[in-house]
Swiss-Prot record:
This is Eotaxin. In response to the presence of allergens, this protein directly promotes the accumulation of eosinophils (a prominent feature of allergic inflammatory reactions), but not lymphocytes, macrophages or neutrophils. Binds to CCR3. One of its GO terms (molecular function) is chemokine activity. Belongs to the intercrine beta (chemokine CC) family. Keywords: Chemotaxis, Cytokine, Disulfide bond, Glycoprotein, Inflammatory response, Secreted, Signal. It comes from Mus musculus (Mouse). Residues 1-23 form the signal peptide. Glycans are attached at T94. One of its GO terms (biological process) is positive regulation of angiogenesis.
């Protein structure tokens, strides 16, 4: 009886920890980049960006979202990528009338 009670307690404990880990959305990256664009994207086509820095992704990247909704991975070390992110940051900070 004691061993079955201990086994049940252990099973419930493991189940509760597992559900907490699976319920935590921040532990799993939403996307990773495996291929980076080699071409510069004109600033006029860019709408926003996000940084991929999760340790589970093999490459650090910037994911640009275009005005047409397409997501494109780019190397954050490239000068044009840094310039584009600065441009988008400034554009988002500028108040619209």
């Amino acid at each position: 009886m004691q061993s079955s009670t201990a086994l049940l307690f252990l099973l419930l404990t493991v189940t509760s920890f597992t559900s907490q880990v699976l319920a935590h959305p921040g532990s799993i990256p939403t996307s990773c980049c495996f291929i980076m664009t080699s071409k510069k994207i004109p600033n006029t086509l860019l709408k926003s960006y996000k940084r991929i820095t999760n340790n589970r992704c093999t490459l650090k990247a910037i994911v640009f979202k275009t005005r047409l909704g397409k997501e494109i991975c780019a190397d954050p070390k490239k000068k044009w990528v840094q310039d584009a992110t600065k441009h988008l940051d400034q554009k988002l900070q500028t108040p619209k009338p």
